[in-house]
């Protein structure tokens, strides 16, 4: 596991790395209430679908562990927990992992056997089950990411028969590594595995405007891991593919997902769709890396995905550490500056939807799924229990 940790947890205490301060400053916020977790997620101090779900679940656990629930009867205790989970869900409704975690935890507390217990004993049993289920979400995520990395690298090896003389170059978008998960990562986890298996030549990461998760976070992770990498702006991808595909053996664009729906349409950070179109035009594989918890089999197509609109200031203003006259960086100072006329109108969707037609493979912890003869992705064999 990478030394980078977005989440530090022990029972009764949760700390979350403030990713808005990266790459210049490591600061952990203590998160002890649902309100603090909501603010942390909404402000994007933590981001990435798996990490969001983990933070929400663990924050509610810490809150319960520390005695926030004053209800006594079983029904009232469950009602209180439901209210906390419903509140946390609204922090990022696009992230299907969060919705899955909410449903799992609601089901967990309703499955606790309370017959013959006093109100106090029943309350203790319900809270204990909730906390243990939340902790299992954290533990399971790391195993999931390692498996995604292995399956993704295997699929690419099968496609390209990679040797020491034909190592591949890949591109990734946004941030899908240790900072977006409990560790290793999804799309960036595949890149890590490619590096570990001697299959990777180079990685490109996009800046990922307007919030710059690529330049602030992914570039930071790649440097930290010693992975050979280059940062490009989002608008450079087409030129890169045209001019350097053959020379650098650019083989794949690998992205994460906030939500994959039944037919394979994928919601991910804004800018993903354009990369998929460019990859298809240039004959480059386009891969989505996502845990099965991010697959929403109840939503038929991407047209039904709710897309969050972000605040206008993300496009018109930017924050960063101060660069001194000699070129050194003063990490003790952060300033916010305007980069556009503040009167300009702004359209700022946080995500876009990539149609399944542009996706070559969806990599999960259970295996890699490719399109069937009908041109759509089918997840029935991968997780039959979700189709009963």
From Swiss-Prot:
Catalytic activity of the protein: 5-(methylsulfanyl)-alpha-D-ribose 1-phosphate = 5-(methylsulfanyl)-D-ribulose 1-phosphate
GO biological process: L-methionine salvage from methylthioadenosine
Active site (UniProt): 258
Signal sequence residues: none
Protein's cellular compartments: Cytoplasm; Nucleus
Keywords: Amino-acid biosynthesis, Cytoplasm, Isomerase, Methionine biosynthesis, Nucleus
GO annotations of cellular component type: cytoplasm; nucleus
Pfam family of the protein (one): IF-2B
Site note Transition state stabilizer, residues: 174
Pathway: Amino-acid biosynthesis; L-methionine biosynthesis via salvage pathway; L-methionine from S-methyl-5-thio-alpha-D-ribose 1-phosphate: step 1/6
Bilayer-crossing regions: none
EC number: 5.3.1.23
UniProt-recorded Gene Ontology molecular function terms: S-methyl-5-thioribose-1-phosphate isomerase activity
InterPro entries assigned: IF-2B-related, IF-M1Pi, IF_2B-like_C, Initiation_fac_2B_a/b/d, M1Pi_N, NagB/RpiA_transferase-like
Cross-referenced Gene3D superfamilies: translation initiation factor eif-2b, domain 1 (1.20.120.420), Translation initiation factor eif-2b, domain 2 (3.40.50.10470)
Predominant subcellular localization, coarse grouping: cytoplasm
Function according to Swiss-Prot or TrEMBL: Catalyzes the interconversion of methylthioribose-1-phosphate (MTR-1-P) into methylthioribulose-1-phosphate (MTRu-1-P).
Family membership: Belongs to the eIF-2B alpha/beta/delta subunits family. MtnA subfamily.
PANTHER family: METHYLTHIORIBOSE-1-PHOSPHATE ISOMERASE
Protein's recorded name: Methylthioribose-1-phosphate isomerase
The organism of origin for this protein: Neurospora crassa (strain ATCC 24698 / 74-OR23-1A / CBS 708.71 / DSM 1257 / FGSC 987)
Gene behind the chain: mri-1
């Amino acid at each position: 596991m990478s030394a980078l940790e977005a989440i530090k947890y022990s029972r009764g205490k949760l700390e979350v790395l403030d990713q808005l301060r990266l790459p210049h400053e490591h600061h952990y916020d203590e998160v002890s209430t649902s309100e603090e977790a909501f603010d942390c997620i909404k402000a994007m101090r933590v981001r990435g679908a798996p990490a969001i779900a983990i933070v929400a679940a663990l924050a509610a656990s810490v809150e319960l562990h520390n005695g926030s629930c004053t209800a006594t009867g079983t029904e009232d205790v469950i009602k209180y927990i439901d209210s906390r989970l419903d509140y946390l869900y609204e922090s990022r409704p696009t992230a299907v992992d969060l919705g899955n975690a909410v449903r799992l935890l609601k089901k967990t507390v309703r499955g606790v056997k309370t017959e013959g217990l006093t109100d106090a004993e029943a309350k203790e049993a319900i809270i204990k089950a909730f906390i243990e289920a939340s902790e299992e979400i954290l533990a399971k995520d790391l195993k999931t990411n390692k498996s995604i990395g292995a399956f993704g690298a295997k699929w690419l090896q099968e496609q390209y028969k990679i040797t020491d003389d034909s190592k591949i170059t890949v591109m990734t978008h946004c941030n899908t590594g240790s900072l977006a998960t409990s560790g290793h990562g999804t799309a960036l986890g595949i890149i890590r595995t490619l590096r570990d298996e001697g299959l990777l030549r180079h990685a490109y990461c996009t800046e990922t405007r307007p919030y710059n998760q690529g330049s602030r976070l992914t570039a930071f992770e790649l440097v930290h891991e010693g992975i050979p990498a280059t940062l490009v702006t989002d608008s450079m991808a087409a030129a890169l593919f045209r001019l350097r595909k053959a020379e650098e053996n650019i083989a794949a664009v690998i992205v994460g997902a906030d939500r994959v729906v039944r037919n394979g349409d994928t919601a991910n950070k804004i800018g993903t769709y354009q990369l998929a179109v460019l990859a298809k035009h240039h004959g480059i594989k386009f891969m989505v890396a996502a845990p099965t918890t991010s697959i929403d089999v109840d939503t038929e197509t991407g047209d039904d995905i709710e897309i969050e609109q972000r605040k206008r200031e993300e496009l018109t203003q930017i924050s960063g550490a101060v660069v001194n006259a000699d070129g050194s960086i003063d990490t003790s100072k952060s300033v916010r500056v305007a980069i556009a006329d503040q009167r300009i109108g702004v359209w700022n969707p946080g995500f876009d939807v990539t149609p399944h037609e542009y996706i070559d493979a969806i990599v999960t912890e259970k295996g890699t799924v490719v399109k069937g003869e009908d041109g759509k992705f089918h997840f029935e064999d991968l997780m039959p229990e979700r189709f009963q």
